[in-house]
Amino acid sequence: MATVTASSNFVSRTSLFNNHGASSCSDVAQITLKGQSLTHCGLRSFNMVDNLQRRSQAKPVSAKSSKRSSKVKTAGKIVCEKGMSVIFIGAEVGPWSKTGGLGDVLGGLPPALAARGHRVMTICPRYDQYKDAWDTCVVVQIKVGDKVENVRFFHCYKRGVDRVFVDHPIFLAKVVGKTGSKIYGPITGVDYNDNQLRFSLLCQAALEAPQVLNLNSSKYFSGPYGEDVVFVANDWHTALLPCYLKSMYQSRGVYMNAKVVFCIHNIAYQGRFAFDDYSLLNLPISFKSSFDFMDGYEKPVKGRKINWMKAAILEAHRVLTVSPYYAQELISGVDRGVELHKYLRMKTVSGIINGMDVQEWNPSTDKYIDIKYDITTVTDAKPLIKEALQAAVGLPVDRDVPVIGFIGRLEEQKGSDILVEAISKFMGLNVQMVILGTGKKKMEAQILELEEKFPGKAVGVAKFNVPLAHMITAGADFIIVPSRFEPCGLIQLHAMRYGTVPIVASTGGLVDTVKDGYTGFHIGRFNVKCEVVDPDDVIATAKAVTRAVAVYGTSAMQEMVKNCMDQDFSWKGPARLWEKVLLSLNVAGSEAGTEGEEIAPLAKENVATP
């Protein structure tokens, strides 16, 4: 367990702290710690009664208090008699830090659970100087490797969720500018050498936060979260959390009723390290067997290793993943289970499809497109946006030519290498291709060569470009997602919301979200071996594109567009399913929530530095 310093008696209450002119924590330190409650510059100090009641303070405010505050207008009706206390821990949280689906989930799912009346926190590293997160002045001491480190917490309250950021130089010093490509390593495909220490620190800090942060931003909940909580650990970076919970806390009578759900967003990244590195984790020898792992690869070392994700699968109380079909794939065998299939078969693995940000991705309000539209005006609007897209990327402007878009990371998982080889087989059709993505330098070079190989027919843009991503999503007729494996996928969800028909590989969440012939076209199942491009996959991709283009301009295409736009991919449905799973863990005080809108008025957008 960590040691809390004296400054932890003061914690962030609201973002009004900095607005009141306090420039540093030194002002707070001048307050005398008396046995009485006091408020200063948005901070609240613990008094003696607080310390005796910290566990009970994690519960919702009383009905009497709720009645007093009922005069305040909220965005929707919420009844919060008793809700769960849910804490999400991850290496990313959108929009502050995001490389893909993980950041989107931690950005979107927590507000949806909060909207159902639960108390929700997210905990993520503070990679940058986020201008909307304030220093709580809470400092804890955590042992990382053979050193004791001081760790601070920053906080902001958005859309009913306590957003907590773990502050330490091990996170902040490594990231300069955009966090997108530097969260895990200096360049794509290269990890930081001290990632074990970085994420060990994150897991331990996450277990301290519910007890030491006395957060009062919500008028529905007050005080520390306490011990009756559900931790949701996401991917290998947080895999140590169930181990630390058991060894450092429950062994000492703390968090006795807490539970851990481990959510797999991408099983390809498991946290495999040298076997001798186990000593860096400061865990008892009794957990070593959960980490013990053998594979046939030479990275990071040949032979025996430790595997963080394996340990989380075995030690967590429940295992989830991000789509039902992906859950089936994970237990199907060594290839798609990436050598963890036999351990997953020992557990109950459930899949819940992800939602999407229906505010950012909304064709009727999208700030990046000049013409707004909905399901009733899509037929008239899309050709005009297509012409703007063609002009923007330098293709001949012709609304009658079908445009196929690709948006994603340029790497083997996303199948960009398969697509590049397939393009030559369907470029004879009356079609244009736009590829937007960044990633491996070799693959970036491949897409940049398309314009020379197929002038007036194909173009590649190897840049991070949000406005262009929105324009492609709205202006293209088809979006292609040729992934070798895809746990859930968001590109196809965005596309369908904009009436852009997806052409997808038959894997993971793509199977769950795209119905062949109704809301899109399926290519088939790809070979998951990434070392080479399977010629059969190239042929299947070209055939699927040919089939889609044949439907273009027909009444069947118009019907498919409307079917796509008629789907509901908001977080409301997934939140109900998540709630059901979390309630099944029977943490004390947990009761079902109430359907409603955001507890706090919805911010126009989360503010995060680039």
UniProtKB/Swiss-Prot annotation:
Keywords: Chloroplast, Coiled coil, Glycosyltransferase, Plastid, Starch biosynthesis, Transferase, Transit peptide
Keyword Coiled coil attributed: yes
Broad class of the protein's primary localization: plastid
Extent of the transit peptide: 1-79
Binding site for ADP-alpha-D-glucose: K98
The keyword Secreted is annotated on this UniProt entry: no
Pfam families: Glyco_transf_5 (PF08323), Glycos_transf_1 (PF00534)
Extent of the signal sequence: none
One Gene Ontology CC term in the entry: chloroplast starch grain
GO biological process, one term: starch biosynthetic process
InterPro entries per the UniProt record, alphabetical: Glyco_trans_1 (IPR001296), GS/SS (IPR011835), Starch_synth_cat_dom (IPR013534)
Metabolic or biological pathway, per its Swiss-Prot or TrEMBL entry: Glycan biosynthesis; starch biosynthesis
Tissues and organs where the protein is expressed, per its UniProt entry: Expressed in roots, inflorescences, flowers, fruits and at much higher levels in leaves.
EC number: 2.4.1.242
Reactions performed catalytically: an NDP-alpha-D-glucose + [(1->4)-alpha-D-glucosyl](n) = [(1->4)-alpha-D-glucosyl](n+1) + a ribonucleoside 5'-diphosphate + H(+)
Swiss-Prot/TrEMBL induction comment: Circadian-regulation. Strong up-regulation at the end of the night and the beginning of the light period.
Sections of the chain in a coiled coil: 438-454
GO molecular function, one term: alpha-1,4-glucan glucosyltransferase (UDP-glucose donor) activity
Subcellular localization, as worded in the UniProt entry: Plastid, Chloroplast
Result of changing E449K: No effect on activity, but reduced interaction with PTST
Effect of disrupting the coding gene: Production of amylose-free starch.
Family note: Belongs to the glycosyltransferase 1 family. Bacterial/plant glycogen synthase subfamily.
Function, in words: Required for the synthesis of amylose. Destroyed as it is released from the starch granules during the night. The circadian expression is controlled by CCA1 and LHY transcription factors.
Quaternary structure and partners: Interacts with PTST. This interaction is critical for the localization to starch granules.
Protein name as catalogued: Granule-bound starch synthase 1, chloroplastic/amyloplastic
Organism: Arabidopsis thaliana
Chain's gene name: GBSS1
